[in-house]
Amino acid sequence: MAAGKVKTGYSLPYVALYSATGTTVSYTSGQKLARGVEASYDVETSDDNNFYADSIEAENDSGTFKSGTLNLTVDGLKTAAEKLIMGLPTATEAGLIAYGDSQAIPDCGVGFIYRFMSDGVTSYTPMIFPRVKFSQISESGATQEDAIDWQTQELTAEIKRAEDTNRTWKYVGEEVSTEAAAEAVIKTFLGITSA
């Protein structure tokens, strides 16, 4: 029997607008973000606070989460998802969306699925970041040569603590046997009821 599990995939990123009233967190306008290509996150923690007595470390207050960065690589955002995470205004009559002073990037909740394998058995784990704020999106593109050069989009978001009583910055779901079951956990958390 394997002692651990190996990560074999990432899929189905979802996003929703975050709001909080007191310590009650809620989400609206949830939707599929794009098709997932790669996901990673880095966190910064405070230093451990050690107390010494009788010439030894007698007590320890472990470091806690301070901040983090979520990096998502996706195939490419559709207009609705880009407008949501970038806080963009309604398009002009000419169909143009203005990035400018009227833009207000909102806090969002983000969820996606990591796939694992252990002893030949596949499992799926939902990952949820209850409050993030996306950075302005940088883009690049290259002309097609002899073959298609598949070009992806990089998204970066600041990981923040939710305003719930626990000040949660991440949720990890139980392992489930199907991707659909993991997806259902994310959609329920983010208040997404449509298909």
Feature map (PLM): residue ranges:
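Charged, amphipathic alpha-helical segments
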Residues: 78-101
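Exposed beta-sheet edge/beta-hairpin loop segments within beta-rich domains
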Residues: 62-63, 99-103, 118, 141-151
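Mixed-charge, glycine-accented linear interaction segment located at domain edges/termini
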Residues: 132-195
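Short helix-loop boundary/capping segments
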Residues: 101-137
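Polar/acidic, low-complexity leader/linker segments enriched in S/T/G and N/D
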Residues: 1-41, 195
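Oligomerization/assembly interface segments of phage tail-like spikes and tubes
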Residues: 58-82, 149-162
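Beta-strand elements of well-folded, non-transmembrane domains
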Residues: 74-78, 114-118, 133-136, 159-163
